[in-house]
A protein has these predicted regions:
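Pre-Walker A (Motif I) flank of P-loop NTPase domains
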Residues: 193-198, 251-252
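Contiguous, well-ordered alpha-helical segments that form the cores/surfaces of helical PPI scaffolds
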Residues: 177-189, 214-218, 270
């Protein structure tokens, strides 16, 4: 896939007109195909559907790609001449401080394969879908999804989905059903307000628990997901920070690996039972909700 790049728009910088300049930059961001409001954060969607939160320096770079700021100055000869300018830091800070008042396209998640809307309709058209606030970023070979599948087609699809796991040593039919539920949940998770976590347990190490989790992650991420080793800090702070980092980065799957003993986390319980998660941004006196 590729995205068209427009001729940079010119924005004049006039002393005492900061609000007007901010509004002009907002107008450019509103028309940009890869800029979104992700909760209260301004983000840019990069290659492969990756979500990158913007800070002041990142926004100055993106603004410089899309716009050419300029102003008038007095030359030595006493004439007004045009001067090209970099994106003003104060204007970028204004944009970031507006939060959800920016009014950009609202983004909940980036998907790389078709999914189901909450009304049961199939979302299979590439691009941004305003009703679900999802961005479908597919490759050059989109999946053809039958809109009215027969029972035979559904059974064939189930057989195809389960084939890689047909020889895996699950203990019982219940264990196989849990893994199937995890895969189906992964496919529709972007349109669900909340969903359960799925745990894999075994009496010995090296039995394939992490592999199963990674397979589920590939269904929702479109690539091998990141694996995070278990942390056992003195309190819940490290878990909370890690969860917020993952959610803020737009990851759709988190493989929490090698849990030994009891895992009791209020932060994890909150993330699983609420459609949003709030925390303080590390290194800043600001909080954000994703």
């Amino acid at each position: 896939t590729f995205r068209m790049s427009r001729q940079p728009q010119r924005i004049e910088v006039v002393k005492g007109k900061g609000s007007e300049t901010t509004d002009a930059l907002l107008g450019v961001l509103l028309r940009a195909p890869d800029m979104y409001d992700f909760g209260a954060e301004l983000v840019v969607v990069g290659h492969g559907g990756s979500v990158h939160p913007m800070n002041e320096h990142g926004l100055r770079y993106e603004a410089g790609r899309m716009t050419q700021f300029w102003g008038l100055r007095m030359s030595k000869q006493g004439q007004l001449v045009e001067e090209l300018l970099d994106p003003p830091p104060n204007i970028c800070r204004n944009v970031l401080s507006l939060g959800q008042r920016r009014g950009l396209k609202k983004l909940d998640a980036v998907i790389t394969a078709p999914t189901l809307r909450s009304d049961g309709a199939v979302l299979a058209t590439a691009g941004y879908d305003a009703s679900t606030r999802l961005l479908f970023d597919c490759d050059d070979h989109p999946i053809d999804v039958p809109m009215d599948p027969s029972r035979k087609e559904a059974i064939l699809a189930l057989d195809f989905l389960w084939k890689p796991f047909s020889d895996f040593p699950f203990v019982s039919a219940l264990d196989r059903a849990v893994h199937l539920a995890a895969m189906i949940t992964a496919a529709v998770r972007p349109t669900l307000p909340t969903s359960p976590a799925f745990g894999y347990d075994a009496p010995v190490q090296g039995s394939g628990k992490t592999l199963l989790g990674r397979c589920v992650g590939m269904l929702t991420e479109g690539k091998d997901p990141s694996v995070w080793p278990h942390t056992a800090g003195r309190d819940d702070e490290e878990v909370r920070k890690r969860l917020f980092t993952v959610l803020r980065s737009g990851f759709r799957c988190m493989v929490w690996d090698n849990v030994v003993g009891q895992f009791d986390s209020a932060a994890l319980a909150s993330a699983l039972t609420s459609p949003t998660f709030s925390d303080r941004i590390l290194g800043a006196s600001l909080s954000s909700t994703v």
